[in-house]
């Protein structure tokens, strides 16, 4: 089977809900990272076979957002593209699908990633609007909740699944708040030291009032304290432990990577950054969706012929502190190896982009620390997980 390599990896800075990127569509964010990934890879855009982009909140974006983004990036009309919706795993699944196509001999060069603007997600009228309301009130649905954050199986918020995990695995409020504080501190330190500079591409933001360049993550709370986190009320269950402070945010952003067949990359004189060793998904009960990374990671490690102890750095999406801690407890994560520059609790979670974002961040962290093996993994709403193992190439 053909080897797949990553030859470039970029992301936008992550915007807060209704923050700096609120006027920039997911398609424009996607176009920005697609163009930048190709430029960083130093490949001829004519050699791009396909573009695969994750995007969850597609309502109102128009046909096939990935195709729109690739055209806006300047790629030729002959380049095909498709959009992936695997909820929080969409961006990483896009990379896995790119690898599969290359391994199958269907392509040599694919741009893969994810894009999301949660700030611009619309509201929907219920189905009665199609046939007429006649009598009574209608209902308006929030696309963020309906298509992104509500469990379609059980009809409750993802936060309740985190409460379920906390109860099932004995994860206390204090443990969750401590993890959240560590995430905030690591992210603040990473921003201060410029650790994200190499992976972030600037976004030119144009509004009616001003034009500016957005290039730094704005969601982290650098001044967060244990006292402030402890004072927050539970967000989903009055007697619960999950709060706005120990959960990820609602955010905007995009990320993209150029994936190539290894021999083709070398023949073109390129220097691959990493080899994709394995990828896998796993299913769990929807009520405990946060545990999805456990079977996914176990499968990915088995396919790579590795043990968790072999992994040098891990990026595990912090959808909620409760699920992150339970996953780490179950798999036996070494806390010194995980989310070394902070995670989604601090940086944010633009759901369709996060899978690609954590892979981009993982790769750059491995480069900065001269590490060889990395693992990226996320839980997925509906009761799934996804994981990928990469090997950095010198």
Curated annotation (Swiss-Prot):
E.C. designation(s): 2.3.1.9
Which residues participate directly in catalysis? 88 (acyl-thioester intermediate), 349 (proton acceptor), 379 (proton acceptor)
Which GO MF term does the entry hold, naming one? acetyl-CoA C-acetyltransferase activity
Q: Output the InterPro entries linked to this UniProt entry.
A: Thiolase, Thiolase-like, Thiolase_acyl_enz_int_AS, Thiolase_AS, Thiolase_C, Thiolase_CS, Thiolase_N
Gene Ontology cellular-component terms for this entry are: cytoplasm; protein-containing complex
Q: What chemistry does it catalyse, as a reaction equation?
A: 2 acetyl-CoA = acetoacetyl-CoA + CoA
Instruction: Provide one Gene Ontology biological process annotation.
Output: acetoacetic acid catabolic process
* Record PANTHER family: ACETYL-COA ACETYLTRANSFERASE, ACETYL-COA C-ACYLTRANSFERASE
Recorded family membership? Belongs to the thiolase-like superfamily. Thiolase family.
Its recorded name reads Acetyl-CoA acetyltransferase
Organism name: Escherichia coli (strain K12)
| Lineage of producing organism | Bacteria, Pseudomonadati, Pseudomonadota, Gammaproteobacteria, Enterobacterales
């Amino acid at each position: 089977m053909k080897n797949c390599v990553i030859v470039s990896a970029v992301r936008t800075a992550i915007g807060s809900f209704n923050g700096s990127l609120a006027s920039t569509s997911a398609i424009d964010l996607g176009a920005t990272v697609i163009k930048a990934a190709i430029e960083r890879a130093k490949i001829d855009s004519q050699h791009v076979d396909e573009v695969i982009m994750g995007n969850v909140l597609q309502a109102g974006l128009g046909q096939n957002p990935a195709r729109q983004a690739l055209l806006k990036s300047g790629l030729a009309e002959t380049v095909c593209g498709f959009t992936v919706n695997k909820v929080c795993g969409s961006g990483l699944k896009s990379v896995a699908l790119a690898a599969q196509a290359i391994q199958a001999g269907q392509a040599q060069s694919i741009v893969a990633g994810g894009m999301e603007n949660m700030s611009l997600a619309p509201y929907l009228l219920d189905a009665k609007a199609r046939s007429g309301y006649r009598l009574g009130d209608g209902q308006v649905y929030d696309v963020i909740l309906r298509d992104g954050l509500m469990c379609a199986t059980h009809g409750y918020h993802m936060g309740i699944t985190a409460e379920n995990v906390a109860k099932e695995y004995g994860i206390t409020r204090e443990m969750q708040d401590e993890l959240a504080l560590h995430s905030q501190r690591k992210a603040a330190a990473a921003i201060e030291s410029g650790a994200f500079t190499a992976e972030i591409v600037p976004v030119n933001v144009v509004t009616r009032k001003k034009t500016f360049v957005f290039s730094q993550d704005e969601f982290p709370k650098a001044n967060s304290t244990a006292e402030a986190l402890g004072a927050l009320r539970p967000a989903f269950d009055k007697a619960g432990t999950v709060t706005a402070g120990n959960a990820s945010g609602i955010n905007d952003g995009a990320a993209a990577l150029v994936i190539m067949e290894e021999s083709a990359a070398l023949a073109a004189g390129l220097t691959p950054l990493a080899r994709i060793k394995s990828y896998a998904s796993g299913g769990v009960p929807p009520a405990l969706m946060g545990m999805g990374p456990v079977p996914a990671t176990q499968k990915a490690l088995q396919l790579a012929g590795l043990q968790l102890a072999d992994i040098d750095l891990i990026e595990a999406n912090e959808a909620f502190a409760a699920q992150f801690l339970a996953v780490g407890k179950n798999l036996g994560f070494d806390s010194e190896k995980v989310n070394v520059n902070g995670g989604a609790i601090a940086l944010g979670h633009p759901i369709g982009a996060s899978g690609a974002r954590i892979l981009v961040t993982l790769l750059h962290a491995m480069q900065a620390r001269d590490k060889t093996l990395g693992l990226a993994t996320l839980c997925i709403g509906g009761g799934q997980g996804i994981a990928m193992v990469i090997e950095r190439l010198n």
